[in-house]
Amino acid sequence: MAYLFTSESVSEGHPDKIADQISDAILDAHLAEDRNSRVAAETLVTSGLVVLSGEITSQARVEPREIAREVIRDIGYTDPRIRFDAESCGVISSLHEQSGDISQGVDGGEEQGAGDQGLMFGYACRETEELMPMPITFSHRLVQELAHIRKETDKMPYLRPDSKSQVTIEYKEDRMTPRRVHTVVVSTQHDEGVPQKKIREDVRDILLPRALPTDLLDEDLILHVNPTGRFVTGGPHGDTGVTGRKIIVDTYGGKGAHGGGAFSGKDPSKVDRSATYAARHVAKNLVAAELCDEAEVQLAYAIGVAEPVSIDVSTNGTGVLPDTELCEMVREHFELSPSAIIDRLDLLKPRYQKTAAYGHFGRPTFPWEELTHVEALKRDAPAVAS
């Protein structure tokens, strides 16, 4: 019997993703001037209004209100008719300084403690060349390509910034080998008066061939386009958006576990972010080293303590070695204190706004996607096995 698995994504113009991008743009602006900035920036967007809040300790001097407007403008919210645009929206800022009780246990060199307690997961598998699950990878491609069509071409000129996608993949009986794309759902905001038939035809004839491999598309594909029949009211005028509400979209689309912590607006002293990136780095290198076909890595931390309180590796029975031995290899090859993670993955570089739409993982420009440990893991595997 076939096995189906579904994941969703949302575009850069989705309200929650607007909030994520603003929060990360504020983080980037502080890191660009002060690498030691401590930032926890939260954003709310609603009809005609942006609210900024959170805690920041930094020597940087930035203008968060202008940063918010620039992000909104770059996404494409420039038309006042849709009731949310960069020039006319209100922006309220209530950012304030971080608690000294937290900073005394977090700041400081090699013994830098974790910014909070918590558990973080990383995942990798062989379904795509990015070593990511196929449903979330294809979902990201759909909304990313929609944004490209909207911003860079004259095709589908009726598109507005807000959109969502959902992809169901049919797998073979092993539940790991993709067979075909079973169902695609695309909901995209559009101008008034555009026939839904036209939008459906354009999604089928323009979007799908650009975004998805045609060898996985067949005549049995189930395609839903704007299933409600209309999507004119969207963006923050249609739904309020808040930082950190798309944590499954940000990660693996429901494959693997999630520790619950969001990423955007947080500097890398917050292990919610940095340790999740490190866990992905570990998992991807294990799979790329052909030590397993699937890897889920859990890291856990205590606030103010540098070393993780636990490390776990699960391969779902696909490992060439027992999971306990792979876990020992991880301990041997990867330093997982906050300071070591920050140094190895170059996490003080202001690149975070780029992560805030279309997924934090499976994108080769990010250092946590680099295969830096593959050869060392391969060399060490026979020694562990013996």
UniProtKB/Swiss-Prot annotation:
Pathway: Amino-acid biosynthesis; S-adenosyl-L-methionine biosynthesis; S-adenosyl-L-methionine from L-methionine: step 1/1. Pfam families: S-AdoMet_synt_C, S-AdoMet_synt_M, S-AdoMet_synt_N. It comes from the Bacteria. ATP binds at H14, D162, S163, K164, R230, F231, D239, R245, K246, A262, K266. It is found in: Cytoplasm. Binds 2 divalent ions per subunit. It catalyses: L-methionine + ATP + H2O = S-adenosyl-L-methionine + phosphate + diphosphate. One of its GO terms (biological process) is S-adenosylmethionine biosynthetic process. Its EC number is 2.5.1.6. PANTHER family: S-ADENOSYLMETHIONINE SYNTHETASE. This is S-adenosylmethionine synthase. It comes from Salinibacter ruber (strain DSM 13855 / M31).
